[in-house]
Amino acid sequence: MKKKKNKVKEYLPLYLMMLPGLLYLLINNYLPMTGIILAFKKLNFSKGILASPWAGLDNFKFLFSSKDAWIITRNTLLYNIAFILVNMVVGIAIAILICEVKNKKMKKIYQSAILLPFLMSMVILSYIVYALLSAENGLVNNTILPLLHIDPIQWYQKPKYWPAILIIANCWKGVGYGCLIYIASLIGIDPTYYEAARLDGATKWQEITKITLPCLVPTIITLLLLSIGRIFYSDFGLFYQVPMNSGVLFPTTNVIDTYVYRALIEQGNISMSSAAGVYQSLVGFVIVMLSNWIVRRVDKDRALF
């Protein structure tokens, strides 16, 4: 008993440091899970959640029988796959380039510059995109396209351009966070590997492909698995605010998160919104478990669990 008490006293500061994080997870992640019950009920506001009649799987049937089910699932999945791949490739490339900078002050400036967009709100990003793509005063229509002898484009009325626009906007905003993690991993690589490679006459490209990338594999796999865990979740602001909620663009910008919001705000259908959220969570859970199982089969040490 004395040993246990001593251990509690010894680790008490660490337990207290954990407490805010645990409370945050409990309040924001676990307590909302009780709302899953709404997906199986026909909510009646006068009766409340518990007294409302059960609907079984009717909300899910309505969701999957609607024409939007396939569109929002396809958009959510394909966009997130593109985001993961593009951000990973660009993040690794920028991290390698920054690590090649010898001047420490310049290296810090570049690191700060690449992280700055990540700290911006999506509202600011939406107005930056609007300043570029506005039909009347946008930089692209008024400056860039005339130089290329191309007629102005009504960007907010042309769905075909928006997959590329959203991928570029997401990469510009989000690549900095992953880039810093890759930089931290690159700093941890033993410099003697590179010295030995140079003595053997290796080129810079060979150093990257034979030393840098293999040493980054554990970090890449960890970030990849964490990203896959949220592959069915989208940045609401990116798909709602950046396209300015343009109805013409819904076929290419409507994802599960925006669909849930519109179903809740415009239709007032909380039960169907909850069903879409449950569907989103279950598919994401299955995908991350499957991905972790595959990694575990290949290399146990690199799996999350």
Each language-model region and where it sits:
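N-terminal Lys/Arg-rich, disordered targeting/topogenic segments
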Residues: M1-K2
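A structural signal for multi-pass alpha-helical bundles of membrane permease subunits
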Residues: N6-F305
